[in-house]
């Protein structure tokens, strides 16, 4: 379900302050996976927490409007079972 248009996009206030005061090339660490990517974020690198570590995410124009958490997967896919013991 989409967010109501009258509410507008969500971004954590502390994150927005960090972005405005950040220097070029600096990785901005954040736990706010739910924050929407704004046009002001383009060209910045965020360290998005996935529950274990910070995943570096470089923001491009195509990412505007999405959430930060979409680009830092929280689950590791181990793959499906092997056929090692199977005889033909």
Curated annotation (Swiss-Prot):
The record's GO CC annotations read: cytoplasm; small ribosomal subunit
Q: Does the keyword Cell wall biogenesis/degradation apply?
A: no
Name the SUPFAM superfamilies for this protein: Ribosomal protein S19
Q: Which PROSITE patterns match?
A: RIBOSOMAL_S19
A Pfam family recorded for this sequence: Ribosomal_S19
Supply the alphabetized keyword list. Answer: Ribonucleoprotein, Ribosomal protein, RNA-binding, rRNA-binding
* Gene Ontology molecular function: rRNA binding; structural constituent of ribosome
Q: Name one GO biological process term.
A: translation
Q: Which InterPro entries match?
A: Ribosomal_uS19, Ribosomal_uS19_bac-type, Ribosomal_uS19_CS, Ribosomal_uS19_SF
What PANTHER family does the record point to?
A: RIBOSOMAL PROTEIN S19P FAMILY MEMBER (PTHR11880), SMALL RIBOSOMAL SUBUNIT PROTEIN US19M (PTHR11880:SF8)
Family, per the entry? Answer: Belongs to the universal ribosomal protein uS19 family.
**What HAMAP family does the database record attribute to this sequence?**
Ribosomal_uS19
Q: What function is annotated for this protein?
A: Protein S19 forms a complex with S13 that binds strongly to the 16S ribosomal RNA.
What name goes with this protein?
Small ribosomal subunit protein uS19
Give the species.
Answer: Mycoplasma capricolum subsp. capricolum (strain California kid / ATCC 27343 / NCTC 10154)
């Amino acid at each position: 379900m989409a967010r109501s248009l009258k509410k507008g996009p969500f971004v954590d206030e502390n994150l927005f302050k960090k972005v405005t005061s950040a220097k070029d090339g600096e990785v901005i660490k954040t736990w706010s996976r739910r924050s929407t990517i704004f046009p002001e974020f383009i060209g910045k690198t965020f360290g998005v927490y996935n529950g274990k570590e910070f995943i570096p995410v470089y923001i491009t124009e195509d990412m505007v409007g999405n959430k930060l958490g979409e680009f830092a997967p929280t689950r590791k896919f181990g793959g499906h079972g092997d056929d090692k013991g199977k005889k033909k």
